[in-house]
């Protein structure tokens, strides 16, 4: 079994507030290309954390690819209450994350800040690599996860960057 964690920018972090934004289709083209590459190289599990934005779009693509490839999808939420306060539209997205092959939460609820690093350490230990939409030009809290991932020997990281997206949009 080979599992890849998929994570990246949340939609508000990159200024995308509408699913019909033309940038979403370019991002999804890149996701499709990269996920097919993973599948053709033996990956059989895609792991999500349940965030809006990049993960949401990657989940949509992964679900489409299930018709062509034998893949499994898991969502491992940080907390059991993840998304409980989201609006109705986002609750629909949350239900898609909960309708995958395997769903768990790591902690029942928030108790202390160290839970975040424990959660990311768990995800790193349970996956062989990560597909991350992230660019050092636009830093977020993902930088802490990436630092841990880069420190792990043999952990495979594939970054989707703004430069790569620009190249795709021009071709």
Curated annotation (Swiss-Prot):
Q: Write down the Gene3D superfamilies for this protein, in alphabetical order.
A: 3.40.50.450
SUPFAM superfamilies hit by this protein: MCP/YpsA-like
Instruction: Write down the InterPro entries for this protein, in alphabetical order.
Output: YspA (IPR010697)
Homology family: Belongs to the UPF0398 family.
Against PANTHER family, the record matches this protein to:
UPF0398 PROTEIN SPR0331, UPF0398 PROTEIN YPSA
- HAMAP family linked: UPF0398
Q: What is this protein called?
A: UPF0398 protein MGAS10750_Spy1462
């Amino acid at each position: 079994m080979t599992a890849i964690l998929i994570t990246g920018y949340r939609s508000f972090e990159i200024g995308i507030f509408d699913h019909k934004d033309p940038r979403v289709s370019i991002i999804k083209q890149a996701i499709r290309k990269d996920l097919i590459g993973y599948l053709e190289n033996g990956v059989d599990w895609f792991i999500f954390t349940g965030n809006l934005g990049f993960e949401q779009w990657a989940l949509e693509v992964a679900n489409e690819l299930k018709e062509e490839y034998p893949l499994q999808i898991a969502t491992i939420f940080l907390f059991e209450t993840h998304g409980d306060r989201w609006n109705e539209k986002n609750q629909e997205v949350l239900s898609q994350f909960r309708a995958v092959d395997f769903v768990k939460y790591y902690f029942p609820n928030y108790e202390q800040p160290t839970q975040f690093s424990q959660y990311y350490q768990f995800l790193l230990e349970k996956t062989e690599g990560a597909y991350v939409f992230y660019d050092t030009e636009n830093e977020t809290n993902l930088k802490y996860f990436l630092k841990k991932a880069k420190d792990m020997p043999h952990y495979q990281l594939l970054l989707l960057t703004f430069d790569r997206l620009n190249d795709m949009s021009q071709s």
